[in-house]
From Swiss-Prot, chain B:
Record bears the keyword Lipid metabolism: no
Topology within the bilayer: Multi-pass membrane protein
Highest taxon of source: Eukaryota
Compartments where located: Endoplasmic reticulum membrane; Golgi apparatus membrane; Early endosome membrane
Self-association state and partner proteins as the record states: Component of the ER membrane protein complex (EMC).
Topological domains annotated Lumenal: 24-40
Role, per record: Mediates Mg(2+) transport.
Main localization of the protein described in the UniProt heading: endoplasmic reticulum
Source organism of the structure: Arabidopsis thaliana (Mouse-ear cress)
Protein name per the record: Membrane magnesium transporter
Residue numbers on the Cytoplasmic membrane side: 1-2, 62-104
Entry GO terms, CC: early endosome membrane; endoplasmic reticulum; endoplasmic reticulum membrane; Golgi membrane
Amino acid sequence: MGSSEKRSKDIMSDIPTFSAENLQNNLKVIQNSRTFLSIIAGVLAGIIGFNGLIGFVFYFVVMLITSVGLMAKAGFSADLYFDSWNRVLFDGFLGGLMSFVLFWTFAYDLVHIF
Amino acid sequence: MNLGFLVGVFGVLILSHAAYSTIQYRGLLKIMEEEFSRPPINVILELIIGLALCMWAALTFPGKFLSIHPDSDENRAVFLPDNSDFMIFNHRGRLFPPQIDMKF
């Protein structure tokens, strides 16, 4: 009885308790920010006239700036709002790539071809 | 509608104006029979300002980050549910006291 009670206490104390609703809210905020900036980066790349790999380099630069902005928004202390630093820095990094290519080609066609 | 949304709309409008300026510039280059190398300086400045405004809007408009720790000040329970008659504490769960330090 004592050992089983101790074991259950250890199990309960080992698992960290997070507020799942707030974690979901934070992840949704990050996804929305990254999606919107992917679209904006695509429009910018199209207007400037980037071709080939320069456009993808531009996308990753904008995503890095977004990561720094999200770090600043979290107050440079990701422990309060997320379970790890990767959530702020790299989550959703490649998710907006298709949106970027879509709006890149769309803006390029509008400005430079038509 | 709040400030973040307005700043985002304004940034998108600036980008639209930059696109229109680039289209005009391309038409001018066609008349002068020259090659396009890069947009003019004012268009680049408009693009940088538009990107900065949209970056600020993307970081403020989707909402604030909420704390995920149950014991932080944001997640304090400030009221009890109405049906207090159904809150029974004398049950078999009292044999396993919880280790969570909840603040009420």
